[in-house]
């Protein structure tokens, strides 16, 4: 089986404002569970942005509770997350992005770290 590189994703979803706060927390935990179990991802960061006003109405709501989750996975099972969003009526909007900019930053930091280790190793052999 071929090795598939782990990628960084950002998933933003909006929960309807008529859902009680306790249920919103449970819904966020369910999304995290799906990312870890079904998508086989590793969560880096969860940002609860809270209630925000919309620029226009979405499904007859003028505001919603925003949550952003940054996670890593190989991307093969992302459809599981999309399916969950689609069948959950409390989630009124969602979008999942691959974060090329964060991947690039991470690769650059790793290459700089390797270069520093190599130059450190070379400096130690000369003494």
Swiss-Prot record:
Residues 106-127 are annotated as: Disordered. One of its GO terms (cellular component) is cytoplasm. Keywords: Ribonucleoprotein, Ribosomal protein, RNA-binding, rRNA-binding. Residues 106-117 have a biased composition (Basic and acidic residues). Pfam families: Ribosomal_S6. Residues 118-127 have a biased composition (Acidic residues). One of its GO terms (molecular function) is small ribosomal subunit rRNA binding. Gene3D superfamilies: 3.30.70.60. GO terms for biological process: translation. InterPro entries: Ribosomal_bS6 (IPR000529), Ribosomal_bS6_sf (IPR035980), Ribosomal_S6_plastid/chlpt (IPR020814), Transl_elong_EF1B/ribsomal_bS6 (IPR014717). SUPFAM superfamilies: Ribosomal protein S6 (SSF54995). Binds together with bS18 to 16S ribosomal RNA. Belongs to the bacterial ribosomal protein bS6 family. This is Small ribosomal subunit protein bS6. The gene is rpsF.
């Amino acid at each position: 089986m071929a090795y598939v590189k782990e990628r960084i994703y950002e998933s933003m979803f909006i929960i309807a404002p008529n859902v009680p706060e306790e249920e919103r927390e449970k819904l966020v935990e369910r999304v995290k569970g799906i990312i870890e179990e079904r998508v086989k991802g590793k969560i880096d960061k969860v940002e609860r942005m809270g209630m925000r006003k919309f620029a226009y109405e979405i499904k007859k709501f003028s505001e919603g509770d925003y949550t952003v989750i940054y996670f890593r996975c190989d991307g093969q099972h992302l459809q599981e997350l999309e399916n969950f969003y689609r069948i959950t009526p409390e989630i009124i909007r969602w979008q999942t992005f691959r974060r090329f900019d964060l991947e690039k930053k991470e690769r650059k930091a790793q290459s700089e770290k390797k270069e520093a280790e190599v130059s450190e190793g070379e400096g130690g052999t000369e003494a």
